Structure formats: C-alpha cells, structure tokens
Amino acid sequence: MAQITKAHHTGISVRSLRESTKFYKELLGFEEVFTWNPQAEYIGVLTGYKDVNLNATILKMPGVDVFLELLEYGNVDLKDIDHGNANPGIAHISFFGDDVDEWYRELTEKGVKSVSAPVTPTIGPNKGGRAIYMIDPDGVRVELIQSSKSFGEYKGE
C-alpha cells in the first residue's frame, strides 16, 4: 500500500488574501515565501471549480519546514461556514509558542478575537502548560500552545 511520507502544507481558504496574509505574517510571525496566481487547466480539475481564478500566498513558519497556503478563490460563489470546534471539518490549526499569555495580550490589543482567555490544561500532553484559541480573519481557530511536550512525546496519564 502507498504511504504518506511527510506533511507538505496546510491550505486555508480565505476571503481576503491581503488581510489573511497580514494576520499570519504580522501577528503570528510567518514569513512569506511567495505569492502567485496559478492558472492552469489542472487547477480547475483539481479544485472542482472549472473557471476558478485562484490567488495564493505561501507562508513558512520560521526555523522549520512548516508551510501554510492561503487561498483566495475568484469566480466562485463563496459561502460562509461555521468554524465552531464541534462542527465537521477542520476545527483548528495549532502552533507551539513560548508565551501564550503574551500572545493573547498582543493579539487582543490588535483587535484579534479569541474563544476565551488563556487556559491551563489539567490533563493530557499539555498538562500544566497554557493554551488559547485565537480567531483568524475568516473565523478559523488558531490554537497557540505553551507546553514542554508534543503529541509524540506524550505517554499517557
């Protein structure tokens, strides 16, 4: 059977490429790799939107090979979706940070909304750390975690 060999990127559909790029670059520290307008027949076939006008920005998390692809779809009827954590689909994306409380202060001062104030997990791999769900310009939950362990290091309670 074929196997997945590693993660490539996470794609997020956005209403405004400019606004979302600013959020991830200026507020979360991602670096812009490139912006492009990929126009080819296979794009329409792959996405299921024959006449799509796609604009994309590729962002990189500093110091690691973690990439976000922000996608703005043109020539397509856009529909808002409810990004609530319990709804089917992508619930959130998550990143480690060195000071969740400072992130919260800085981001809320700049008008970024959150689901709650930072919390201290009492169970699981992030026990004793700090966590927060911030909300990006399109309603996507962005979890910031301050913890000494990753999922791969967790051995259970």
Q: Model-predicted segments: where are they?
A:
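Residue-level recognition of conserved beta-strand positions in structured domain cores
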Residues: L70-E72, Q146
